[in-house]
Amino acid sequence: MDTIAARALTVMRACATLQEARIVLEANVMEILGIAINRYNGLTLRGVTMRPTSLAQRNEMFFMCLDMMLSATGINVGPISPDYTQHMATIGVLATPEIPFTTEAANEIARVTGETSTWGPARQPYGFFLETEETFQPGRWFMRAAQAVTAVVCGPDMIQVSLNAGARGDVQQIFQGRNDPMMIYLVWRRIENFAMAQGNSQQTQAGVTVSVGGVDMRAGRIIAWDGQAALHVHNPTQQNAMVQIQVVFYISMDKTLNQYPALTAEIFNVYSFRDHTWHGLRTAILNRTTLPNMLPPIFPPNDRDSILTLLPLSTLADVYTVLRPEFAIHGVNPMPGPLTRAIARAAYV
C-alpha cells in the first residue's frame, strides 16, 4: 500500500503544477501524467486530458485525483454528488508498476509508515497537570491534617508546596500516575511572600532547598528529573515556607504534531475553507474516517490511517485550488460572491 499512496501523491502533485494551459511541463511531470492518465482513462472510460482548458476537462482531472486520493486511503465515499461517481477500479491504476513515483513522495510515505508503527520520546505541548480535577489558589498556604509538607496543583504546569518550620518531605507522589513521562524538566522558586489561611502575609526565609536524588538544586534553573529519583523539599528555618515548582516541559511517548514534517500545515490545509463545494466534499470524505469532519482534531493523530488520509487530502486541496472545478455536492448550496472571512466563519457553525 505504500507504493500506491506514493503514486497517488505523485500524480496529484503533478496535476497541481498545471497552473496555466500553456505551461512548459517538466519531463518527469509529462511522463507521470502521460502514463497515469492513459491507464486511468483505459480502466474508467473517462476522458482526462493532460492539459485541461475547459471547465469540463478541469472537472475530469479533479475527479481523477479524487479517485486516486480515495483509493490510496481506502475510503468509499458513496453517492455524494450528481456529477461524480467513485471508480473503484482506480486502485488498479495506482497498482500499475509503470507509473513512476517521486523520491519525495516515497520518502514521505515511508516516514509516515515508520513513525506510526513505533513510539519515541517527544516534547509534549500540554501542561503536565492539564487534566487535574482540582486546583488551589496560588500563593496561599494550605496544609493537610497530620502533614508537615503539602504539595498541591495550582495551574496546568505548576505545583506549590507548603512547609512547616523545620519540615522535610518528598513531593514525588503528586507527579505519579500522570502522563507516563520519560523526563520532566522543572524549575523551582521560593514564594517570597504568601498568604496564610487567616489572610496575613508571611515571608519565605532563605535556606529552603529542593533536592533531586539527594543533590540540592539551584533555584531558577531548569532541572532534568526522570520522575523516579526522590524529589525532596526542606525548610530548615523556624518559620513556615512555600516553594513553587514549575514543569517547563516534559517528554513522553505520546505522539505529537512533530511525528511527520509539516503535519500542522497539512492539517490546516485540509480544514481550511476554500468554498462551499470543497467544504462539503471534505466533510463528506472525513465522515467516512475517524477524523473530525469540520474542525481539526484536538489531539495529534497517532495512527497510520489518519495521517495517510490527511496527507493525500491536503494534496487534493491544492489540486482543487489549481484546477478550480465546479460540481455539485448533495446538501451544499454554493454562495455566490467573493470569499470573505465572515462567509468562511459561517461555514463552520
UniProtKB/Swiss-Prot annotation:
Major subcellular location class: virion
GO molecular function: host cell surface receptor binding; structural molecule activity
The entry's keywords: Capsid protein, Glycoprotein, Outer capsid protein, Virion
InterPro entries per the UniProt record, alphabetical: Capsid_hemagglutn (IPR008980), Orbi_VP7_capsid (IPR001803), Orbi_VP7_capsid_C (IPR023178), Orbi_VP7_capsid_N (IPR023176), Virus_capsid_a-hlx_vir (IPR008935)
UniProt xrefs under SUPFAM superfamilies: A virus capsid protein alpha-helical domain, Viral protein domain
Pfam families: Orbi_VP7 (PF00897)
GO cellular component: viral envelope; viral outer capsid
Residues annotated as glycosylated: N287
Subcellular location: Virion
Keyword Flavoprotein: no
GO biological process, one term: fusion of virus membrane with host plasma membrane
Oligomeric form and interacting partners: Homotrimer that assemble in a complex of 260 capsomers on an inner scaffold composed of VP3.
Function, in words: The VP7 protein is one of the five proteins (with VP1, VP3, VP4, and VP6) which form the inner capsid of the virus.
Family statement drawn from the similarity comment of this UniProt entry: Belongs to the orbivirus VP7 family.
Protein name: Core protein VP7
